[in-house]
Amino acid sequence: MNRRHRIYEGKAKILYEGPEPGTYIQFFKDDATAFNAKKHEVIDGKGVLNNRISEHIFSHLGRLGIPTHFIKRINMREQLIKAVEIIPLEVVVRNVAAGSLSKRLGLEEGTVLSQSIIEFYYKNDSLDDPMVTEEHITAFGWAVPQEIEDIMQLSIRINDFLSGLFAAANIQLIDFKMEFGRLWEDEAMRIVLADEISPDSARLWDMQTREKMDKDRFRRNMGGLINAYQEVAKRLGIINENEPPRPSGPVLVK
């Protein structure tokens, strides 16, 4: 069996050299991490569900004309994606107070915000991903003003779509994290959505019960993470009500 060239390994995914120039294979791991990997556990089946959910969301966004790195899902754990130059920022869109926003500003968790808030965090685990301003971003050369504007506009469009998508599934989108990258095509460059959107990167609550259906179940030692992710997938129509879980999926050749 052929050994693949590993490009990068993060906390939840591995990037491998793709079959064609300008492509990667993105492999979804079962690792669950929190607090910049200070808390870590392997949860069988998490990567499979995140792959399916992220594929579903990115496919919808692509049909809406929102540029992404996604090409297609290859199998239960892998996607074929376009190679992009990742901008070292986490972009967080908040619709409801929760998590660090509640702690930072003393807001009761669950408080609906009068308008959606977009925040930027510098991707650096050793610094615990500090929040930064647009001035920091341009001063340190992480992105230029036009790129920031593109990211802001895309974030608003993505939030509008996802809020409706999840609401139709009786799920409230509390907040979510995104990453963006530069995609070079011939001499032209454009900003595209990268990474993933899944219950790992979004806070999702049941609209009636306010039950958490995301990685907070791991962060807060609530248990039931796989069941929650499966429920999200079922409500989005990704898996059938009676479809048995297939946790492990193919074994990756390293």
From Swiss-Prot:
EC numbers, comma separated: 6.3.2.6
GO molecular function: ATP binding; phosphoribosylaminoimidazolesuccinocarboxamide synthase activity
Catalytic reaction(s) noted: 5-amino-1-(5-phospho-D-ribosyl)imidazole-4-carboxylate + L-aspartate + ATP = (2S)-2-[5-amino-1-(5-phospho-beta-D-ribosyl)imidazole-4-carboxamido]succinate + ADP + phosphate + 2 H(+)
A Pfam family the protein falls into: SAICAR_synt
Gene3D superfamilies assigned to the protein according to its UniProt record, in alphabetical order: ATP-grasp fold, B domain, Phosphorylase Kinase, domain 1
Pathway annotation from the record: Purine metabolism; IMP biosynthesis via de novo pathway; 5-amino-1-(5-phospho-D-ribosyl)imidazole-4-carboxamide from 5-amino-1-(5-phospho-D-ribosyl)imidazole-4-carboxylate: step 1/2
One term under GO cellular component: cytosol
Enzyme class: ligase
Keywords: ATP-binding, Ligase, Nucleotide-binding, Purine biosynthesis
Biological process terms in GO annotation: 'de novo' IMP biosynthetic process; cobalamin biosynthetic process
SUPFAM superfamilies: SAICAR synthase-like
InterPro entries listed in its UniProt record: SAICAR_synt/ADE2_N, SAICAR_synt_PurC, SAICAR_synth, SAICAR_synthetase, SAICAR_synthetase_CS
Sequence similarity: Belongs to the SAICAR synthetase family.
UniProt cross-references to NCBIfam families, sorted A to Z: purC
Name of the protein this chain belongs to: Phosphoribosylaminoimidazole-succinocarboxamide synthase
Gene responsible for this protein: purC
